[in-house]
Amino acid sequence: MYKRQVFSERGKSILNQKGELVCKSPFPSMPNKFWNDPGGKKYQSAYFLKYKNIWHHGDYAERKKNGGYIIYGRSDATLNPGGVRLGTAEIYSVIENFKEVKESIVVGQKWDNDVRIILFVVMSKSSSLNDDIISRLKKRIRSEASPRHVPSKIIQVSDIPRTKNGKIVELAVKNTIEGSKIKNVQALANPNVLNEFKNLKQLKF
């Protein structure tokens, strides 16, 4: 059995708490190097930088007493409103039940010495974002996740940035709305979509 655990920020194994998913032993399909990375610097930075000699993949998870695991999303995309760490998956699981919403992406925006949650939605062809849908989304998120998960802003966009293998890229959106540098733009299938997220009036107040 591969030595999977969940670590705290201090590198301690934790149970029934949310933290970083790690693996303390080799496992099948585990890469041992990157292409064009002769010194192994990128490889080490990607998987072994956070905890010395322990594989860290960047998943925010919880290890349960019965041996099961719950994955809450990417740890680099977790939300921290009021200093409380929240997983994005808890919000997505609510939104996917709304037929009016085709796709969504949720990020944290630095705001007033804190972080506020921003939800971007791509609506289905027959729908347009309105006050009724916003109200229903917030109500369901509040009841099925928690009051802390409720977005401060819900904004309609035409598309969502994704990698060439189809994964949505929360960190690229977060960096865009905060005016930070976007890493690995070349890995995006639709980088021009990020222009829509720049200087949005709704994020100025």
Predicted regions and their residues:
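Conserved small/polar residues in nucleotide/adenosyl-binding loops
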Residues: 1-5
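Glycine-rich, charged/polar anion/phosphate-binding loops
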Residues: 7-11, 105
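Short, acidic, Ser/Thr-enriched surface-loop or helix-capping motifs
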Residues: 8-9, 16, 63-64, 162-163
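Conserved ATP/PPi-binding loop(s) of AMP-dependent carboxylate-activating enzymes
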Residues: 10-48, 86, 181
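AMP-binding/adenylate-forming catalytic core of the ANL superfamily
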Residues: 27, 32, 41, 45, ...
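General small-molecule cofactor/ligand-binding pocket signal
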Residues: 154-157
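Short arginine-rich
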Residues: 175-181
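Linear-motif-rich, low-complexity cytosolic tails and juxtamembrane regions
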Residues: 201-205
